[in-house]
Amino acid sequence: MGRQPCCDKVGLKKGPWTAEEDRKLINFILTNGQCCWRAVPKLSGLLRCGKSCRLRWTNYLRPDLKRGLLSDYEEKMVIDLHSQLGNRWSKIASHLPGRTDNEIKNHWNTHIKKKLRKMGIDPLTHKPLSIVEKEDEEPLKKLQNNTVPFQETMERPLENNIKNISRLEESLGDDQFMEINLEYGVEDVPLIETESLDLICSNSTMSSSTSTSSHSSNDSSFLKDLQFPEFEWSDYGNSNNDNNNGVDNIIENNMMSLWEISDFSSLDLLLNDESSSTFGLF
């Protein structure tokens, strides 16, 4: 929910305080003491916010406030407390009477930081700057060392793929490798691992050996099928006239058979034509 506002802030005065306002606030607190800061403006007759009255009193109007810069002892105290508490200025101011948290913070930012850096001390960690710089450089070195193996891991698969493709081309031959390129394209050739490549190479050698054996067996069977019948050429010199007569007889018989077939077929055609013409007349 958050803290409720101290007042409505309607018709209240803003800006720097006047001497009369400071006098009213000092007289009220010295006579009545510190009470609820929300009620102080109404009781003292000030047109200010309760928070503004509190800050004006604690930072400027308190009688126990110390004016001026911090002493060497106070600076050492602030450095020791800052190394333990960090930027908790209100807690640091509680250990330094007469000093406000705002005053200590301003003095830290304007004076103490510069002194520590000149002494070679980091104002945030209170360690020597050389050690802090080394600690800052170590993560960068780790990042650089991690990026080099990452680049190597990205380059190794590319080299392996190129080697695998060259081995595949040697094992399959130019024709089959061109068929793969036409089907998939150069960029779409599937990546093949080394184990599968060894299997492909062994299968290709086995298939080549089986294909050569099958070709040889097919050739032998084909030659067996093409074996021609043996002819007896006995008494070739003595029976030339008989062979010539036999050949002449075969030719004459074939010519007669062809003539008889063609003759009968032509007669059938003539008979069919005559029958069709006679039926057409009647």
From Swiss-Prot:
Induction: Induced by salt stress, drought stress and abscisic acid (ABA). Down-regulated by salicylic acid (SA) methyl jasmonate (JA). One of its GO terms (cellular component) is nucleus. Pfam families: Myb_DNA-binding (PF00249). One of its GO terms (biological process) is regulation of lignin biosynthetic process. Expressed in chalaza of mature seeds, cotyledons, rosette leaves, cauline leaves, veins of stems, mature siliques, sepals and styles. Expressed at low levels in roots. It is found in: Nucleus. Gene3D superfamilies: Homeodomain-like (1.10.10.60). Keywords: DNA-binding, Nucleus, Repeat, Stress response, Transcription, Transcription regulation. One of its GO terms (molecular function) is DNA-binding transcription factor activity. SUPFAM superfamilies: Homeodomain-like. Residues 37-61, 89-112 bind DNA. Residues 9-61, 62-116 form the HTH myb-type domain. Transcription factor that acts as a positive regulator of abscisic acid (ABA) signaling in response to salt stress. Acts as a negative regulator ABI1, ABI2 and PP2CA, which are protein phosphatases 2C acting as negative regulator of ABA signaling. Binds to the DNA specific sequence and core element 5'-ACGT-3' found in the promoters of ABI1 and PP2CA to negatively regulate their expression during ABA-dependent salt stress response. Plants overexpressing MYB20 display increased tolerance to salt stress. This is Transcription factor MYB20. It comes from Arabidopsis thaliana. The gene is MYB20.
